[in-house]
């Protein structure tokens, strides 16, 4: 299940099986599906794992983004998943955006790059968050 048009197309082109794309309005800038239809659909679903992208990640405010509609969809995904994996490159660490959509204690795993500040990585681990450092 995804709200991202590019990800849905990539997965289906790669033969990933049955890809569910949420319905709703499409934001031109991100090509993400948002709105009431997407939220109602997500309310009916449960996922073992949610992979969530973010615009910003801080210890105090968790995950945030600039758009309230995208934040609502991401928040619903977080709520309805057993495990939450955050995809966040190091340039987004320590930044805050307008709308917070998940607190730090909702995160199970953060996948970031080796540019992440070591003190930040240590703080995530102190909060029982697994950190995966990817080479780029």
Task: Please name every model-derived segment.
Residues 1-2:
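Catalytic beta/alpha-barrel core
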């Amino acid at each position: 299940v995804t709200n991202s048009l590019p990800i849905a197309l990539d997965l289906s082109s790669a033969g990933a099986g049955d890809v569910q794309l949420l319905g709703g309005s499409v934001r031109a800038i991100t090509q993400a599906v948002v709105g009431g239809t997407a939220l109602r659909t997500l309310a009916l679903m449960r996922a073992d794992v949610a992979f969530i992208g973010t615009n910003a990640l801080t210890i105090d405010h968790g995950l945030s983004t600039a758009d309230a509609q995208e934040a609502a969809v991401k928040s619903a995904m977080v709520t309805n998943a057993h495990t939450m994996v955050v995809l966040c490159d190091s340039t987004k660490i320590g930044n805050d955006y307008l709308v917070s959509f998940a607190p730090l204690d909702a995160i199970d795993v953060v996948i970031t790059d080796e540019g992440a500040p070591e003190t930040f990585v240590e703080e995530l681990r102190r909060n029982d968050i697994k950190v995966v450092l990817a080479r780029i």
